[in-house]
Amino acid sequence: MIEKLFKQNLQKFVPYTVPKLDYEIKLDANESFLKLDDYMMGKILNKIKDVEFNRYPDAGAEKVCRAYSKYVGINRENIMAGNGSDELIQIIIAALVDKNENIMTVEPDFSMYGNYSEIGGGKALIFQLDEEFNLDVDKLIESANVEKVKVLFLSNPNNPTGKVLKREQIFKILNGCDCAVVIDEAYVEFHEESIVDSIYEYENLIVLRTCSKAMASAAIRLGFLITNSFMLNEIKKAKPPFNVSSVTQAIGEAVLEETEYIKKSLENIKNERSFLIDKLSAFKEIKLYPTCANFILIKFKDAEFVYKYLLENKIVVRNYKQGRLKDFLRITVGSREENEAVINNLSKILK
């Protein structure tokens, strides 16, 4: 009887799980391979000493939002912190999408846009990218308007392809679509061309950012939503109180203050990306897709075989197994040692 209590639309979902795999090199989640150094850890510990663990967090996450405001060059009143971008996506949907209303995203893209919408009672419509994973902007606009979409979600750079939309393309979408447009810039630091400065010009633009990738802080689950003041005040109505822990706020503030450290880390990751692309390009039987992120999407003749071979050699990468990406693997850019391990193992099974 108890199963009748649950939403019908939950029946097609399975709980998100991370498989327990035996590996030594982890290149499946687009994390930074750089651990925070001793100086950064010391600064973080000093910040945490001031946390009042008996008190609820600052509900507005004021200090970390001010730090992010300085980092991104956007007014503080246009920024809201969240418990990772995932929570911010859920808040956007809760604020804007009623039951049976539509959101739209593209395929391939981050799957949780659609999942969170459908869990909340909305409908997720999928617009297909072409064979080379390019977006037909005109057809997207037409489809979004015909379907009366409430929110359009696009990651830029795209996850998992690594491709980017140019600012002019995004402007065209913003001008043409009768809906809120969420540009998820989780990987923007690896590309450096952001749309965030346009929030003052476009009333339907929402930008998402994260500390998980470029700032090597995935463990703390800290994201930011950036939009115009009216949009933000309305979205805040759907935000849970005290949603970002005091520890997360303290660590985020410490990391964001060290802009030179972040810059040097990005240079390191970009250098390793160039190294990995150069070495992978020598294999003639695979297809690399140009990337502006910290990962590389690769098409193999037998992706499942390559995935299992790498895993047998203690290297885990992202295996999609089905759908449009069943012949693809996504490999996170790792350290030089990790990247060389990938190349050395692939050289034993590829030409």
Curated annotation (Swiss-Prot):
Modification N6-(pyridoxal phosphate)lysine occurs at: K213
Catalysed conversion reaction: L-histidinol phosphate + 2-oxoglutarate = 3-(imidazol-4-yl)-2-oxopropyl phosphate + L-glutamate
Annotated pathway: Amino-acid biosynthesis; L-histidine biosynthesis; L-histidine from 5-phospho-alpha-D-ribose 1-diphosphate: step 7/9
Domain of life of the source: Bacteria
Parts of the chain that traverse the membrane: none
Cofactor: pyridoxal 5'-phosphate
GO biological process, one term: L-histidine biosynthetic process
MF GO annotations: histidinol-phosphate transaminase activity; pyridoxal phosphate binding
UniProt EC number: 2.6.1.9
Principal EC category: transferase
Keyword Amino-acid biosynthesis: yes
Assigned keywords, A-Z: Amino-acid biosynthesis, Aminotransferase, Histidine biosynthesis, Pyridoxal phosphate, Transferase
SUPFAM superfamilies assigned to the protein according to its UniProt record, in alphabetical order: PLP-dependent transferases (SSF53383)
Transferase is among the record's keywords: yes
Family membership noted in the UniProt record: Belongs to the class-II pyridoxal-phosphate-dependent aminotransferase family. Histidinol-phosphate aminotransferase subfamily.
HAMAP family according to UniProt: HisC_aminotrans_2
Subunit text: Homodimer.
Protein name per UniProt: Histidinol-phosphate aminotransferase
The encoding gene: hisC
